[in-house]
Amino acid sequence: TIKIGYVSDLTGATALWGTAGQYGAELAIKQVNENGGVLDGKMLELVPMDGKGEPADSVSAFKNLVEVHNIVAEIGTNFSSCNIPMASVADEVKVPIIGTAASNELVTVDENGNLHPYSFRMCFIDSYLGTVIGNYAYDTLGSRNAALFTVAGNTNSESVGQFLRDAFTAKGGTIVADEQCQDGDVDFRAQLANIGAKNPDIVFVIMNDYAKNATFAKQAREMGIDCMLMGHDGWDSAQLAGEAEGALENCLYVSRIGFSTPEAKAFGEEVAKTYNITMEGECLFGHDGVMWLVDAINRAGSADPQAIRDALEQTDVFEGLIGTLVMDPATHNPSMACAVYECHGDSFDFKEIIEAQ
């Protein structure tokens, strides 16, 4: 049996995501094993371990998987803060790890830009997403005067915001208001007053909490700010549109392709049915993590961790449920197509694909 580790937030506030990823990976492994496994009949086994969404716990979980369970590779976590310290450990123990939604630059390279040879990811990075959003707002939506709203001290929010700002202004757009909140804030009216005074044609709302995004939208509308609100993958929740109670009607966010293809939707529905959970995008990452490792093991002709690492790095094109992944061997960052979602009533519906840039 070939063991694959899975570290994620299986308990705590965000366990919804971690468990969805685990179930996606388990179902993918079940399907692979039913079809004869890998390397002429070897079976796969998933060994999940709770990292609680905390860096220290995630590192301990990964070490345990390597030392006690002899895993050949690891999938997870979905947090950059956890994968950054895990990357150094992966290099030491020479076991490849694949972050799912860990989008900070430092997941695969250190502060000096040196590659972590054993750390990979399956999502686009903050700079890529920020650039895509800035370009789309300028080119496709015709926005020229934008407000930007980010969370102070939140790496993802500030990083996406920075690259979005750079892309939008490089095209000739103007950021007329640049406002921030603290992590725990739920009242955004002071910042919204400043934004409203500048009369932007769009507000970029880069927060990673659907309840806060909904609150922001409702407060903006109450204060007479009725322009387009636009977000990033931090808006990715089935709850957001309903929570916003109409305040996000016709608003957009850009994220991964998610459930917008029939294959992804069918798999999501199968996970939801099999494990009795709601359909969360993280289950697609679990699936694709397993299938990318299967692809790498088969190409390598070996389940040796070093051979798997080499094959992951040399991935020309991997067709997953979250879209087509093209690996950059120099950075271990994939370039991927993104999807635009538009709010109608209680849901965000797939609008269009933005091809990989």
Question: Model features per residue range: what roles?
Answer:
Residues V271-L284, V294-D349:
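Segments of small-molecule ligand-sensing domains
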